[in-house]
Structures are given as structure tokens and as C-alpha cells.
């Protein structure tokens, strides 16, 4: 548990420090669940936090599916959150692009859920066809569940031949599962960047736009202004959850086991 102004404090369990907070931002993978399995004790901790009047908001880096899919996944594990209590980096991408529309068409990659739509923006679900890549004016990478070297090479060659805006809805490098780590978009993008492709525009933790939206949502859920010093980000990853929270001025809580 990181006090921004008092150093680091180690606590045996999250429930031991609940009295320090009026609101908690909760990462999903590694905090609430690991793959299809729930983290032991988290249901009881969530229940105690709610009993203490703490406002809860799941803030997850996930672009392949929308926030409703995450809600349903958590519900099947016994964790109940309302639609408003979950913000995904995919949702952040949808909101940002609604207000900052690139000149279309926008090529969509890695979508596993409902259609990704932005009002008044022509979105095309790309296939492994280089001519489709070359016809769009910008790209949005949602996830890498089915990513392979063909997708990687097509994106590289298309951007290398004709640089265009690239938006990425998940800044994770890896995600924890029960017996493995899945490779996430930032890993693949790091290889493109090392080969000279321009930096993408990232949505999700550790970047501030998702925390801006989270603060607005916390105010809506709680019905009051909660100081940053009373809001904690609970995560298991230093370079997304903890870095993002500390940079934004929140307290950060690193879950280590």
C-alpha cells in the first residue's frame, strides 16, 4: 500500500486498510480474478467495502470485449457490479473517438465482442487482406486474442509504407491466467515501435484519460466529491495500475499475492 506523502506501508490484506479510503478503483485480472477463477477472499473484501460505504469501480484494461461482457464474466464468478461500476479501456476508446473523430474510415482489429461503433464514423472490421489495411485512414487495435504474425506483418508494412494514426485500446504487456500469461497488445506494439513505427495513442492504464473518466464516474456513483487522497487504485502490475495511479495523484495498492 503506497502513501504518496508518507512512504510505503505493508498490510497483510486489503481489508486491513479499507478505513483509509472512501473509494477504490479495482483492476480486474490479478485482483478480482485470475483467468476463470476468482481471487480467494475477494468477495468478502468487496462486501466489507460496500458495508463501509466505500464507492467501488472496476477499471480494467480490456479492449476485445465491451464492459457488459466483463460484468457478466464477474457475475458468473459471484462478483456483482452494476454497469456503471465498470470502466474498460475499450469504453474509453469509444468515448474518446466519439469526441475526437479521425478522418474515416477507421480500421478495427482484434474485436471479439459486439460491433465497435462510433456515431458518424465509418468503422471497418479488418481482415487479413493488405488491401483493406491500405484503404483505411487510421487503425484501432482492440485486442490480440487471435493475433499472429500475419496480422503483425500486415500492420507493420501498411504503417511503414503510409504512416497513419494508430489507436490502441489495451496498454497491457501480459495478463495473468491460472497457468500462463497471455501476450497483450503492448507487447506486439513494442516490436513495431522498435522497427520505426510511430508511437500509438494509448487508452487505458497507466495513461491519464482512463483516470479522468474514472474520477467522473466515482463522483456520479458516490454523489459527492471525494479527494484524490481518499481514492485508492488496487492493482497487481507496476507499469499500469501503480504507475498510472501515482502519476495521477491517487494512492496505489499493489497486490502481491
What are these model-predicted stretches?
Residues 1-257:
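HAD-like aspartate-dependent phosphatase fold
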